[in-house]
């Protein structure tokens, strides 16, 4: 016997109110299910008061308006110090090392489901926390819980939540994970919530709408270098390897070269030793394709992970379709993964997340690529 959510029994849920439509509707749905609901707004980044890019003040205003409309308390907390130490420093260190990190995954791990949960426990006496993420939880008859993809395949966010522990999933509720996005907006509109037509947030929260290269340059000095073809010909100059990622097509500034075909150029390698960006033409160029990878910093939601030589599926980036793979343990902290078919633009530093059907098993950080 399994169920998708625990019963309320008047238990207290602290909802992470972001000022967006998903958390707004999450709070409403939990109230309808009989939970005692309160909101908690997190401030995770200390921007200048004059900063035109960060909408934290507007988000706080919207979150408060929603809580007032629903008739629930709203609390605020500042996690900027924790965010800087555990998310932003990691983000900078990874870029400095030539990798491409995903700070949203680290934010979920360290802030939204750790610092937030601790605050909800210690200060607000919570039974559960809830977020507006598009994932589901399943409660099994043996007391275990599993994290499943969201019903809306276009909005599923399990890729960003693979680092959650079994205990964190057991303490978390995800009401909108059972719905399609359009249904969430319809509920918000019927309720007259100010967030019903608010644009979804995109990009990295501490960058906002700013140009990524400009933001990064304020923290890491750029080191210009050559752009070479896969045959070794110098065809341009890059402004810094950290601004580029494997598989990147736009923003290279090397179109229309003599004696080359019209296929677009893609980044296929970053040579950190020589500070050279290597490019090749065509999205299926052999230098862009991988037949496997090694993955470390493993985390399994159910604590144990899949069995050795398991045949499951993997995503190596968000919104990528699942690819079949075979997973082999090299030791407790490292695995080798062989794909059922070649995969383009697998990127060290990004996360590989594994699935068994709809169940998110967990994942790790891509370390090295296997080609050929």
Swiss-Prot record:
Reactions the enzyme catalyzes = S-sulfanyl-L-cysteinyl-[protein] + uridine(34) in tRNA + AH2 + ATP = 2-thiouridine(34) in tRNA + L-cysteinyl-[protein] + A + AMP + diphosphate + H(+)
The active site lies at: 107 (nucleophile), 205 (cysteine persulfide intermediate)
Broad class of the protein's primary localization:
cytoplasm
Family annotation (Pfam families):
tRNA_Me_trans, tRNA_Me_trans_C, tRNA_Me_trans_M
Per the record, the GO terms for biological process are: tRNA wobble position uridine thiolation
Family statement drawn from the similarity comment of this UniProt entry: Belongs to the MnmA/TRMU family.
Q: Which PANTHER family match?
A: MITOCHONDRIAL TRNA-SPECIFIC 2-THIOURIDYLASE 1 (PTHR11933:SF5), TRNA 5-METHYLAMINOMETHYL-2-THIOURIDYLATE -METHYLTRANSFERASE (PTHR11933)
Protein name (database record): tRNA-specific 2-thiouridylase MnmA
What is the taxonomic lineage of the source species? Bacteria, Pseudomonadati, Pseudomonadota, Gammaproteobacteria, Alteromonadales
């Amino acid at each position: 016997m399994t169920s998708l959510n625990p019963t309320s029994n008047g238990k207290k849920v602290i909802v992470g109110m972001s000022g967006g439509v998903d958390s707004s509707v999450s709070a409403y749905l939990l109230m309808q299910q009989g939970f005692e609901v309160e909101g908690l707004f997190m401030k995770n980044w200390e921007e200048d008061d004059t900063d035109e890019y960060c909408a934290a003040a507007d988000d706080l205003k919207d979150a408060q308006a929603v809580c007032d409309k629903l008739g629930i308390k709203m609390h605020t907390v500042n996690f900027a110090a924790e965010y800087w130490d555990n998310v932003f420093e990691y983000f900078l260190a990874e870029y400095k090392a030539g990798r491409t990190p995903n700070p949203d995954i680290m934010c979920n791990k360290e802030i939204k489901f750790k610092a937030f949960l601790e605050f909800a426990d210690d200060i607000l006496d919570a039974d559960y926390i809830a977020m507006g993420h598009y994932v589901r939880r399943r409660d099994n008859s043996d007391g275990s819980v599993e994290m499943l993809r969201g019903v809306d395949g276009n909005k599923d966010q399990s890729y960003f939540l693979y680092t959650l522990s079994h205990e964190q999933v057991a303490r978390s509720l995800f009401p909108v994970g059972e719905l399609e996005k359009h249904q969430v907006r319809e509920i918000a509109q019927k309720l007259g919530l100010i967030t019903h037509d608010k644009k979804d947030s995109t990009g990295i929260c501490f960058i906002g709408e700013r140009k990524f290269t400009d933001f990064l340059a304020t923290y890491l000095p750029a080191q210009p270098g050559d752009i070479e073809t896969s045959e070794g010909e110098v065809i341009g100059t890059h402004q810094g390897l950290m601004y580029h990622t494997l598989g990147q097509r736009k923003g290279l500034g090397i179109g229309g070269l003599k004696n080359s075909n019209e296929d677009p150029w893609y980044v296929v390698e970053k040579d950190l030793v020589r500070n050279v960006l290597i490019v090749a033409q065509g999205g299926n160029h052999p230098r862009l394709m991988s037949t496997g990878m090694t993955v470390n910093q493993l985390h399994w939601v159910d604590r144990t992970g899949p069995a050795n030589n398991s045949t499951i599926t993997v995503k190596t980036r968000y919104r990528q379709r699942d690819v079949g793979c075979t997973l082999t343990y090299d030791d407790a902290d490292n695995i080798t993964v062989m794909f059922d078919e070649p995969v383009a633009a697998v990127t060290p530093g990004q996360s590989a997340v594994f699935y068994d059907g709809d169940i998110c098993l967990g994942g790790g950080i891509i370390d090295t690529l296997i080609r050929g």
